[in-house]
Structure formats: structure tokens, C-alpha cells
Swiss-Prot record:
Protein origin, superkingdom: Bacteria
Record's protein name: Large ribosomal subunit protein uL15
SUPFAM superfamilies: Ribosomal proteins L15p and L18e (SSF52080)
InterPro entries noted in UniProt: Ribosomal_uL15, Ribosomal_uL15/eL18, Ribosomal_uL15/eL18_sf, Ribosomal_uL15_bac-type, Ribosomal_uL15_CS
Biased composition (Gly residues): 21-35
Region spans: Disordered: 1-37
UniProt cross-references to Pfam families, sorted A to Z: Ribosomal_L27A (PF00828)
GO biological process: translation
GO molecular function, one term: structural constituent of ribosome
Function description: Binds to the 23S rRNA.
Organism: Agrobacterium fabrum (strain C58 / ATCC 33970)
């Protein structure tokens, strides 16, 4: 086989249908768009318009709200931290905080702080300095002989 002998598989690509090229083509005149009306015209269709039926965004109820005072944490599991320590991305002898986790590539954005969850196992003895941790995570950290310092989340007071 040579480069000039390479061909696409039979039936792998279809020719596109050229519409509006004469009545004899079968797709001429209206070009498969029916007769007149908004949907027969050129240009982009109106977003969310479903031809007159009640659109999905009006059929479904409104739900929830955005809490402007809520805190959003970067969540990380003990297993991921242990994997980073094993891969020598995190130094177990140094304090592990948000900056260290970000530098190691364990989290992408710090947001309002880091919260540790109990997924996976922690075998290394480490010192944590984070904004929060789940109860099972705290138990696993203490069981591994590690220490954790929970930082207060900075919340701006509104007047």
C-alpha cells in the first residue's frame, strides 16, 4: 500500500445535499423549508422559541437562589492529598495549606478556602492549615497522627 492508494471506506462520507438548485433536483425552490413563515426565512432562529408551544424554560418552575453571603470552598479529599505526597508533589514535613495545594496542582482555585473530605486514606503524618474539614476527615487525620488547624473564613460585614 502506498500513500496515493489510500481511500476512504465505501459509504463513510455522504455528499452534502445542495438545496435550492432547481425543481428537478428534488430539493429546489423552497429547499426543504416548507412554504413561507418565519422558519422559511434566512437567519438564525429565535432562541427558546418552540413554534408557539409553551417553551421549556416556562414549563419548568423557578428553583433556588444565589446566596450572596455564601462561602464556596475548594474541596479536596484525603486520598488526593496522599497521592500528591506519594508523588512528591507535596512536602509532608511542611504545613499543607491552600497555597501549597494550589502549587502542587491538587486544586485549581482557592475560592473562599479549602475544605477536606474523608475520601481515601491518609498514611503520612502532616500538618494541615485549612478553612474546613468534614467530621470523618477530622477523625482520619487524627488517626494518622496528623494535626489540623481550622482557619476562620473571612466574611465581609455588610452595613
Amino acid at each position: 500500500m502506498k500513500l496515493n492508494e489510500i481511500r476512504d471506506n465505501e459509504g463513510s462520507s455522504k455528499d452534502r445535499i445542495r438545496v435550492g438548485r432547481g425543481i428537478g433536483s428534488g430539493k429546489g425552490k423552497t429547499g426543504g423549508r416548507g412554504v413561507k413563515g418565519q422558519k422559511a426565512r434566512s437567519g438564525v432562529a429565535i432562541n427558546g422559541f418552540e413554534g408557539g408551544q409553551m417553551p421549556i424554560y416556562r414549563r419548568l418552575p423557578k428553583r433556588g437562589f444565589n446566596n450572596i453571603f455564601g462561602s464556596e470552598f475548594a474541596v479536596v479529599s484525603l486520598g488526593r492529598i496522599q497521592t500528591a505526597i506519594d508523588a512528591k508533589k507535596l512536602d509532608a514535613s511542611a504545613t499543607i495549606d491552600a497555597a501549597a495545594l494550589k502549587a502542587a496542582g491538587v486544586i485549581r482555585r482557592v475560592k473562599d478556602g479549602v475544605r477536606i473530605l474523608a475520601d481515601g486514606e491518609l498514611t503520612s503524618k502532616v500538618a494541615f492549615e485549612v478553612a474546613g474539614a468534614s467530621k470523618p476527615a477530622l477523625e482520619k487525620i487524627e488517626k494518622a497522627g496528623s494535626s489540623i488547624k481550622l482557619l476562620a473564613v473571612a466574611v465581609e460585614a455588610s452595613e
